[in-house]
């Protein structure tokens, strides 16, 4: 009787082992054959060529969704490459150097333009310093990152407002020496074609970013405007989502830094005059 029980137990163990091997083998085959499809955006840079960008929703899903929606709505058409520094090239201002913040009415057809609901919006920064742990994409050459404001250089307490101030302007990494951006800016894509186009612009075109005032506005002289008119223009921006609907991004009303400063100064002078 004991031998029969042992035999049954061994048979059960053998069956379970075979099933486990089958499941593990199936998962290995599935992982090897299942291709991850990423959305792709193409910028047609007038007189220069095309740049293709692969997007990574697994790292920054809301940033990717917002970028896709802006491309679909034509936001980047006729915008320019407007600035560069030692590690990065900047994209997304108009041909007079103005940063045109998108409004909800642009991306949401249910919102009527010019109404109270059609306000300028921003999105939450998807990076470690902002409490988001899933974005491990590093700022390396060719990586695309979302530009945001840094109000803390003027008011140190405005960290949260700074982290969540990005919406549309982009930084394209032109160097691997950009590790200082890791964890404090949202990287969400990478150039897969046309890097030579960007390098030509970066190395040969004299691009001067307009100066930014303390309230976040830009000051451009007539000569600056003339210079901007000669900067590389995005003739068109298109997106291929491979049939996937990424929906609408989660947004928040843009922080009004100018009003904040005005109220801060008014409160200060009111207190000093009492």
What are these regions (language model features)?
Residues 1-274:
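Cyclophilin-like peptidyl-prolyl cis-trans isomerases
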């Amino acid at each position: 009787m004991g031998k029969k029980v042992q035999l049954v137990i061994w048979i059960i163990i053998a069956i379970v082992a075979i099933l486990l091997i089958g499941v593990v083998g199936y998962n290995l085959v599935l992982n090897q054959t299942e291709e991850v499809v990423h959305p792709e955006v193409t910028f047609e840079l007038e007189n220069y060529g095309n740049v293709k960008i692969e997007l990574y929703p697994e790292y920054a899903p809301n940033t990717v969704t917002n970028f896709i929606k802006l491309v679909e709505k034509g936001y980047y058409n006729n915008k320019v490459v407007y600035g560069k520094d030692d590690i990065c090239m900047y994209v997304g201002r108009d041909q007079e150097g103005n940063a045109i913040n998108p409004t909800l009415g642009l991306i949401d057809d249910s919102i009527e333009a010019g109404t109270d609901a059609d306000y300028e919006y921003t999105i939450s920064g998807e990076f470690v310093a902002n409490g988001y742990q899933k974005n491990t994409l590093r700022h390396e050459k060719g990586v695309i990152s979302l530009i945001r404001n840094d109000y803390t250089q003027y008011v140190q307490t405005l960290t949260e407002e700074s982290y969540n101030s990005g919406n549309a302007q982009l930084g394209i990494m032109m160097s691997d020496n950009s590790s200082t951006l890791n964890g404090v800016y949202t990287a969400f894509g990478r150039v897969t074609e046309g890097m030579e186009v960007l390098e030509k612009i970066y190395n040969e075109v004299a691009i001067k970013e307009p100066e930014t005032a303390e309230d976040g506005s830009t000051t451009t002289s007539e000569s600056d405007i003339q210079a901007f008119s000669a900067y590389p223009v995005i003739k068109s921006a298109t997106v291929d989502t491979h049939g996937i609907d990424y929906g609408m991004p989660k947004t928040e009303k843009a922080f009004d830094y100018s009003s904040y400063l005005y109220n801060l100064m008014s409160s200060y002078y009111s207190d000093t005059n009492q």
